[in-house]
Amino acid sequence: MAFIELKEVFYRYPESEEWVLKGVNLSVGSEKVVITGRTGSGKTTLLRVMSGVALKVYGGELRGEVLIDGRVAYVPQEFDLYILMPTPREELTYILSAQNLGLNDVEVRIREISELLGIKELLDRRVVKLSMGERQRVAIASAIALNPEILILDEPFAHIDPKGAVDLVRLLSNLGVSTLVISEHKLRYLANIIDRIVVLRDGTVVYSGSLEGAPKDPDIEWPLSMLRW
């Protein structure tokens, strides 16, 4: 079973004396988990640590223990910067070819992934001409092409309209990924598909559990209140 476990994790960025994460203990297994909290609470940094990119990409200092068991794919907020090829087809071909698949197998996977993500009609269009919502689906398709056991998404609803959000929720509920971790404050979209919510405050986990069981703590009322929008 794929899992991620953090034990007493502290993290800070280069040239900063302030710890962004402060003694985080968190374990995620085969489940759909949303990480929420106020702006500046450390959500994005936590996902970077959980995906393994924090030190590799940003450097800085990490203390504690991070255990990652399983193939991880990470889609950051700046997802469009990580699409390297001119068209979605070329992007998927590039990723799948690196997995030593034959040409026929690559084409089969492109067809499967494009149908799953609803980007079949976008495959040969230039990425720069796509809307933000369309680019986001391409970015998620690229992540799925890596055949991950753990998929981590940072603020996936930030650049899409309500209809696009409904479509994305439907997509996320049917991806078939063992472990799904999402950083998001628009909980109204995800309330019906998540197994657990983790609330961050000032770099610390202040609640981890079900939406229904969340305590009436003022530190977590703010993100949970978004369910009543």
List each language-model region with its residue ranges.
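Conserved ABC ATPase signature
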Residues: R126-L130
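H-loop/switch region of ABC-family ATPase nucleotide-binding domains
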Residues: S183-H185
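Conserved beta-strand-loop-alpha-helix hinge in the C-terminal portion
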Residues: T204-S225
